[in-house]
């Protein structure tokens, strides 16, 4: 119980203390395990591949793979597949279009995205869901310290509407090593918290990330995740 409480305090301090320092900050970077999006897209005529694998409490697991390409100068399209190995065996696909409204020229930027997704649960197909999101990013302290914020609207299962939000912070300890923390919601229940570390195996090309997270006030909803982001230079 003491360890569980300590972990929750660590998450809370990581997110809210950083947010208190960072109300003007964000460095856009590859974080394949974070749910909070940033206001950047892949470079023009380039692609990126992100994948993640989560080990969930109770023996279940889930994975996701998402390739994304910038088809022009300011229009990124991504296709995703995700699946969970548990009693329900949920799996599904998603497609997202994203564009930058204000580039990160100075200390902040804004983007918009629209995602369409569909899940299948125990051979039962759900309706097509859609999610409109507005990511904002801010830079501070020579782009080493940062903040991403998301606010969006989701039309989910059975056409249930939901205002979704997310706050993520990150700090670059060096050119290769960084730490991140975030809090976000996905439904009308308690929000989630997550802390991550990432390491650039190949600078600006290959990033490895590890994270731990849980839903607040829900001891059984915890996970450990591994993520990989690959951005080829060609």
PLM regions: where:
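Cleavable N-terminal export/targeting peptides
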Residues: 1-35, 234
């Amino acid at each position: 119980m003491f360890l569980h409480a300590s972990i929750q305090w660590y998450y809370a301090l990581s997110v809210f203390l950083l947010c208190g320092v960072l109300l003007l900050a964000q460095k856009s970077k590859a974080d394949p395990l974070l749910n909070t999006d940033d206001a950047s897209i892949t470079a023009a005529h380039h692609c990126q591949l992100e994948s993640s694998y989560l080990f969930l409490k109770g023996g279940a697991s889930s994975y996701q793979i998402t390739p994304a390409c910038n088809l022009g100068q300011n229009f990124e399209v991504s296709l995703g597949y995700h699946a969970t190995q548990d009693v329900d065996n949920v799996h599904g696909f998603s497609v997202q279009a994203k564009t930058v409204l204000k580039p990160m020229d100075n200390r902040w930027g804004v983007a918009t995205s629209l995602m369409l997704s569909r899940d299948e649960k125990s051979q039962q197909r759900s309706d097509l869901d859609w999610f409109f999101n507005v990511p904002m990013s801010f830079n501070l302290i020579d782009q080493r310290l940062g903040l991403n914020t998301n606010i969006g609207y989701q039309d989910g299962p059975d056409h249930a509407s939901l205002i979704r939000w997310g706050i993520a912070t990150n700090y670059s300890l060096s050119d290769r090593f960084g730490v991140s923390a975030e809090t976000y919601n996905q439904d009308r229940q308690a929000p989630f918290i997550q802390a991550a570390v990432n390491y650039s195996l190949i600078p600006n090309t290959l990033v490895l990330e590890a994270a731990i997270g849980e839903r607040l006030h829900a001891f059984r909803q915890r996970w450990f995740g591994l993520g990989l982001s690959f951005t080829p230079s060609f």
